């Protein structure tokens, strides 16, 4: 109930024509893109998916907003995350290439390590980590330092909220996306201020293309779970 595995359909006839082949002869590699579960939706990876589509059968994890998952479905923790990733890799079969983008790096590595330990025949052909903090202690940033300075109870009391009654997941305890978004913005505060200032100036100048790109980015970036 916490994730859907999406497969992107491709125009095989157009691909075959472009390659001078029969559609039935196309055997492109399978690529599983593990999207972050860090407040945003998988749509943030639209550009990544588009880049893989011409040469790959692309699958992506579409994590469900926890406020839409009833409490009766149980909790979702790190062990569940690892189990979900392993189950999806197994479902796609051997020879799949796994690409974890940012946050899912550690749980994806754990899932594949468990598959290797068990000599699972469905273990992937390759794994790629893009911007993933495998060992965050090696390059500590502000969030790392905050995690070391605060006790566990502080995070529980200040960052975990209860889903309100208007949603199917009412009473579920979650870390809401708006808090993560606030952290993201504060880490690059000057950059976001400059972006909006430039946006304002471009509107005055009548630069429609640039303003449309700005709106499109922030419509996506500000949409959180």
Give the location of each predicted region:
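Gly/Ala-rich beta-loop-alpha elbow adjacent to hydrolase catalytic centers
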Residues: 100-108
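Short, surface-exposed "cap/lid" segments of acyl-processing enzymes
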Residues: 1-69
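Beta-sheet entry/capping signal
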Residues: 30-31, 57-58, 95-98, 125-127
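Domain-level signature for proteins that mediate thiol-based redox and metal-cofactor handling
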Residues: 34-37, 42-43, 70-85, 116
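Alpha/beta-hydrolase-fold enzymes
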Residues: 93-94, 111-225
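A short secondary-structure junction signal
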Residues: 17, 43-46, 109-111, 138-142
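Generic beta-sheet signal
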Residues: 61, 99-101, 130
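Conserved acidic catalytic loop of the alpha/beta-hydrolase fold
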Residues: 68-70, 80-97, 109-113
């Amino acid at each position: 109930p916490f994730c859907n595995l999406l497969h992107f359909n491709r125009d095989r006839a157009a691909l075959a024509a472009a390659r001078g082949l029969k559609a039935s002869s196309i055997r492109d590699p399978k690529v599983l893109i593990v999207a972050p579960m860090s407040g945003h939706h998988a749509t943030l990876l639209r550009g990544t998916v588009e880049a893989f589509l011409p040469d790959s059968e692309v699958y992506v994890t579409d994590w469900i907003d926890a406020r839409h998952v009833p409490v009766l479905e149980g909790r979702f923790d790190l062990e569940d995350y690892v189990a979900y990733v392993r189950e999806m890799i197994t479902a796609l079969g051997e020879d799949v290439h796994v690409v974890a983008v940012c946050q899912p790096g550690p749980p994806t590595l754990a899932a594949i390590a468990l598959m290797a330990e068990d000599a699972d025949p469905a273990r992937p052909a390759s794994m790629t980590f893009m911007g993933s903090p495998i060992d965050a202690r090696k390059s500590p940033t502000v969030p790392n330092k905050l995690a070391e300075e605060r006790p566990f109870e502080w995070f529980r009391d200040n960052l975990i909220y209860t889903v309100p009654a208007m949603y199917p997941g009412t009473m579920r305890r979650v870390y809401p996306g708006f808090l993560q978004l606030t952290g993201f913005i504060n880490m690059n505060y000057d950059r976001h201020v400059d972006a909006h200032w430039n946006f304002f100036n471009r509107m005055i100048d009548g630069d429609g293309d640039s303003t449309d790109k700005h709106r499109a980015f922030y419509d996506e970036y500000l949409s959180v779970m």
